[in-house]
Amino acid sequence: MKPSEIREMSIEEIDAKIRELRLQLAKERGMLTMGTSLENPMVIRNLRRDIARLLTIKREKLREMRKK
Protein backbone atom coordinates (compact mmCIF):
# COMPACT_ATOMS: atom_id res chain seq x y z
CA MET A 1 0.00 0.00 0.00
CA LYS A 2 1.15 3.47 -0.78
CA PRO A 3 1.18 6.10 1.96
CA SER A 4 -1.01 8.38 -0.16
CA GLU A 5 -3.68 5.65 -0.31
CA ILE A 6 -3.55 5.19 3.45
CA ARG A 7 -3.81 8.92 4.16
CA GLU A 8 -7.10 9.02 2.24
CA MET A 9 -8.58 6.36 4.55
CA SER A 10 -10.44 7.10 7.78
CA ILE A 11 -9.10 5.84 11.10
CA GLU A 12 -11.80 3.14 11.21
CA GLU A 13 -10.80 1.93 7.75
CA ILE A 14 -7.15 1.87 8.79
CA ASP A 15 -8.03 -0.20 11.89
CA ALA A 16 -9.98 -2.67 9.76
CA LYS A 17 -7.09 -2.99 7.30
CA ILE A 18 -4.63 -3.56 10.17
CA ARG A 19 -6.81 -6.37 11.53
CA GLU A 20 -7.07 -7.91 8.06
CA LEU A 21 -3.31 -7.78 7.45
CA ARG A 22 -2.48 -9.15 10.92
CA LEU A 23 -4.79 -12.10 10.29
CA GLN A 24 -3.16 -12.73 6.93
CA LEU A 25 0.30 -12.47 8.55
CA ALA A 26 -0.70 -15.04 11.18
CA LYS A 27 -1.87 -17.42 8.44
CA GLU A 28 1.37 -17.02 6.49
CA ARG A 29 3.47 -17.59 9.60
CA GLY A 30 1.38 -20.65 10.44
CA MET A 31 1.99 -22.10 7.01
CA LEU A 32 5.70 -21.45 7.41
CA THR A 33 5.73 -23.13 10.83
CA MET A 34 3.96 -26.20 9.47
CA GLY A 35 6.72 -26.60 6.93
CA THR A 36 4.75 -25.51 3.91
CA SER A 37 6.92 -23.61 1.48
CA LEU A 38 5.59 -20.18 0.63
CA GLU A 39 4.96 -19.21 -2.97
CA ASN A 40 6.60 -15.86 -2.33
CA PRO A 41 8.83 -15.58 0.74
CA MET A 42 8.63 -11.78 0.56
CA VAL A 43 4.95 -11.89 1.55
CA ILE A 44 5.67 -11.90 5.29
CA ARG A 45 8.12 -9.02 4.99
CA ASN A 46 5.71 -6.97 2.89
CA LEU A 47 2.83 -7.61 5.31
CA ARG A 48 4.93 -6.45 8.25
CA ARG A 49 5.91 -3.30 6.40
CA ASP A 50 2.33 -2.54 5.37
CA ILE A 51 1.17 -2.94 8.98
CA ALA A 52 3.94 -0.61 10.18
CA ARG A 53 3.00 1.95 7.51
CA LEU A 54 -0.66 1.81 8.56
CA LEU A 55 0.19 2.22 12.24
CA THR A 56 2.50 5.15 11.55
CA ILE A 57 -0.05 7.07 9.50
CA LYS A 58 -2.78 6.25 12.03
CA ARG A 59 -0.63 7.76 14.77
CA GLU A 60 -0.01 10.86 12.63
CA LYS A 61 -3.74 11.32 12.12
CA LEU A 62 -4.46 10.94 15.84
CA ARG A 63 -1.82 13.56 16.68
CA GLU A 64 -3.38 15.98 14.19
CA MET A 65 -6.79 15.46 15.77
CA ARG A 66 -5.44 16.17 19.26
CA LYS A 67 -3.82 19.42 18.14
CA LYS A 68 -7.11 20.75 16.77
UniProtKB/Swiss-Prot annotation:
InterPro entries: Ribosomal_uL29, Ribosomal_uL29_CS, Ribosomal_uL29_sf. It comes from the Archaea. GO terms for cellular component: ribonucleoprotein complex; ribosome. SUPFAM superfamilies: Ribosomal protein L29 (L29p) (SSF46561). Keywords: Ribonucleoprotein, Ribosomal protein. GO terms for molecular function: structural constituent of ribosome. One of its GO terms (biological process) is translation. Belongs to the universal ribosomal protein uL29 family. NCBIfam families: L29. This is Large ribosomal subunit protein uL29. The gene is rpl29.
